[in-house]
Amino acid sequence: MPACRTLRAMHALFPCLLLLAAFTTSAREVAAPAEHVDADGPYVFVTAKGHEAAWICNDHIVHRTLPARGDTTQVVPECGYPHPVTVLPPRTAEVAQYPATPRIVAVSDIHGHYDLLVRLLRAHHVIDARDEWSLGDATLVVAGDVFDRGPQVTEAFWLLYGLQQQARAAGGAVHFVLGNHETMVLYDDLRYVNPKYLRSAQLLGRSYPALYGPDSVIGQWLRTRPVMLRIGDTLFLHGGIAPENLDLVRGMDATNATYQAAVGLPRDQVKAAPDTARLFDGKTSPIWYRGYFDGQLDTAQVDALLTQLDLARIVVGHTSMPHVSTFHGDQIIAIDSSIKNGENGELLFIEDGLLSRGLLDGSRLPLAEGKIGLED
């Protein structure tokens, strides 16, 4: 620290600030469980006889054994998520490369703010007043990070789970791409978990990651989600692709399969194994990379990267912005619009190659011009 005190130029403080930030992050502790949970659930688990569902209602557990009806199971709400849920049989990992589609809507980093997400999707007629899919044959992409921070993680996951079914029936699609917070929670890094969920886990007699284990419906769903998704000439992922990792995009199917196989494994194990270490690297992996925004790459380097991958643009979350923003001549689009703060948020629209952002009041504007160095 003496070296920091002797620095005279403001820009020279940057390494020290990074050191302080790293110390602060590593020192963050898991919160104590909340004293009371008003409403949470359902948590639906696969059993030998079908499904079991559990809710926390007024800090008490409600259990239901759910009979199957053919291939599906219906879950009627008790508290928590307010809509009925149709549980489908587990699906194998879906294809993560699709042809171009005329209309794509994208959002990321919901972080437990279900109510805000619903307001945003309703404002742009992605869902109707009953929170059901109303975008026809269009596509919705959610670029990671439903877990952590906010108090409505469970509701957000079930909304996306149901919308995926409804969109498919209408000829559209909903895609969820894994973020770093999905990885963190499932390998038991609980530093950002809302205290509500630690209380829910306590009442249900499971660890929080076990509520999303391989025997849970949402846990199974998460384990079949990709870490990167290509639609036409647009790549969607949570963090970004570092120049040294272009082969991960070229071998996208193998990359996604490796991630999916590693979801829920202990952190030390995935970071030590040669085939997964760089996929979980805290600086350069697809779920953590921030190099498009901190000056590591200039526009010429970004252009070269996209040319090698035959892409028009890369759409990422992870790095928080005040608005959906464009960088490097519309080649990098940052869609983490700080929904995590629970106050505002925006959607990205890609319509026949034209880009715009949708605001909470239902209006549309051009993308904001991003500023290099703005990083969270």
Model-derived features: positions:
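N-terminal secretory signal peptides that target proteins for export/translocation
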Residues: 1-8
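Sec-dependent signal peptide recognition
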Residues: 8-17
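Feature recognizes metal-dependent phosphohydrolase scaffolds
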Residues: 26-376
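Hydrophobic h-region of N-terminal signal peptides that target proteins for export
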Residues: 17-26
